[in-house]
Amino acid sequence: MTHDNKLQVEAIKRGTVIDHIPAQIGFKLLSLFKLTETDQRITIGLNLPSGEMGRKDLIKIENTFLSEEQVDQLALYAPQATVNRIDNYEVVGKSRPSLPERIDNVLVCPNSNCISHAEPVSSSFAVRKRANDIALKCKYCEKEFSHNVVLAN
């Protein structure tokens, strides 16, 4: 194996690989989706070279598989991501996120007057695709925000 073909992040026997994450987004995904709340080994590659993207992030989680809902929620942050299911070091399934109708329990409403900040309720946003943007509407205050505003919160 030549130096150019060497794996930059160790292979896993069984679990999930989230590939083609835009550079600088990997840590945000780990935090928002609470992917670190496990006792399983997690391998993170940051700013890895990518032919398509220039640079990319990569997350590997052993013995853990994402639900279809979790995969789709990645669409806001990494619409071009590929989620691979690994078994016995082989890719046994591949999926790409598609924009869900709702995103629950992940984001925080940017409206400081929203009841979701004062009450013990789970966040919930309706997702709408616009011409050049994605709009998120809070279930509680019913205010609509550009997804960039909510993601920066």
Curated annotation (Swiss-Prot):
GO terms for biological process: 'de novo' pyrimidine nucleobase biosynthetic process; pyrimidine nucleotide biosynthetic process. It comes from the Bacteria. SUPFAM superfamilies: Aspartate carbamoyltransferase, Regulatory-chain, C-terminal domain (SSF57825), Aspartate carbamoyltransferase, Regulatory-chain, N-terminal domain (SSF54893). Zn(2+) binds at C109, C114, C138, C141. The keyword NADP does not apply. Binds 1 zinc ion per subunit. Keywords: Metal-binding, Pyrimidine biosynthesis, Zinc. InterPro entries: Asp_carbamoyltransf_reg_N, Asp_carbamoylTrfase_reg, Asp_carbamoyltrfase_reg_C, Asp_carbatrfase_reg_C_sf, Asp_carbatrfase_reg_N_sf. GO terms for cellular component: aspartate carbamoyltransferase complex. Pfam families: PyrI, PyrI_C. The keyword ATP-binding does not apply. Its cofactor is Zn(2+). One of its GO terms (molecular function) is metal ion binding. Heterododecamer (2C3:3R2) of six catalytic PyrB chains organized as two trimers (C3), and six regulatory PyrI chains organized as three dimers (R2). PANTHER family: ASPARTATE CARBAMOYLTRANSFERASE REGULATORY CHAIN. Involved in allosteric regulation of aspartate carbamoyltransferase. Belongs to the PyrI family. This is Aspartate carbamoyltransferase regulatory chain. It comes from Shigella flexneri. The lineage of its organism: Bacteria, Pseudomonadati, Pseudomonadota, Gammaproteobacteria, Enterobacterales.
